[in-house]
From Swiss-Prot:
Cofactor: Ca(2+)
Species of the source: Arabidopsis thaliana (Mouse-ear cress)
Catalytic residues as annotated in Swiss-Prot or TrEMBL: R330
Record Pfam families: Pectate_lyase_4 (PF00544)
Name this protein carries in UniProt: Probable pectate lyase 9
Amino acid sequence: MATSSLKLTSACFVLLFIFVGCVLTATNLRNNEISRSRKLKTEDSKSFNSSPMTTRLDGVVELNEHAVTDPDKVAHEVSNLIHMSEQNITARRKLGFFSCGNGNLIDDCWRCDRNWNKNRKHLADCGMGFGSKAFGGRNGSYYVVTDHSDDDVVNPKPGTLRHAVIQVEPLWIIFKRDMVIKLKQELIMNSFKTIDARGANVHIANGACITIQNITNVIVHGLHIHDCKRTGNVTVRSSPSQAGFRGTADGDAINIFGSSHIWIDHNSLSNCTDGLVDVVNGSTAITISNNHFTHHDEVMLLGHNDSYTRDKMMQVTVAYNHFGEGLIQRMPRCRHGYFHVVNNDYTHWKMYAIGGSANPTINSQGNRFAAPKNHSAKEVTKRLDTKGNEWMEWNWRSEKDLLVNGAFFTPSGEGASGDSQTLSLPAKPASMVDAITASAGALSCRRGKPCY
């Protein structure tokens, strides 16, 4: 009897030792991943901030420096990070720990934190894709927006969003309360700014909207942007020392013009005069993620026009977005550059989902495409403004996309052969897209609780 008790006690100690070892292993895996990510981000941030770049960008050379030489490698690295995240989440679940991780690499990095409001700037460590080095105002002070008005676009009142975004120094901009901001003229941002609307219900609506022009390092997170109108032909301040005459603003929700290191994340965008997100005039190093797009015609334009060859260096990641109700086309519409479209949910379109001209490279991975009932609109892709069969040389790839309701993707170029050497590693399975994109759009965040 004593021998049996001794054996039972010994077995319990062995099991306890194994359990503790597993806990420490899983914790170390997660901590090592986070430490590595933060170290790389910090080193990149220090390097970037010590560069001789001015607040506003000028010329092709500076923007070229922000484009990577091997975009397929970046897509490969993104997939590796997704795989690492999945391994760590699986390890925690096997040990019986609760995990809020759902395979969305960006959200899994920060959304589980109940103290997100005390660690707001950790968001800047969580970017992925071509815009992963968009640090925004991480190295600056907080600026609290207390006033929803926009009465004076030349001499904006302190406490307003316009006053915040034109400042020269890095700023992390947050909001004291819920507010609806009706901008009289386009909101012209300055470099190294984060607009972080978590914890408040903030709408930019029924007026002008956001312009990111010839600047670098901007994060826009958590806004509702809708019903943007065409404005302009007035003087608008763009910095404390400069105000200038502005021509017509088209009425885009977010216009990114000649800028780099930009991250547009977790916004709800709809029903604007022109585009919802336009990326043009040599912009590069952009990530557009976790957004919810609805009720709009021309959703996303990536590339100025066919003759604007500076856009050949454009590199954009479009990830984890939900392209939803009432959309017609351009999700996105691409020119010249390299575009990684990964794990998005396409539940509605009336004409086509992904289109392009001027020989863009489009790498589509793990997306879910649900075609409309209209039999003439089942094709996901659309080549525009092409001569003869020249489009057959364009590299448009589809890898493990989920095509439902008769949807079909027409590959071309290297994509037509399915050559795995030219493709990055698989993204999350398209069957997981519903979970990954379930929280796309502006989140509901309360202090002391994870954001949902």
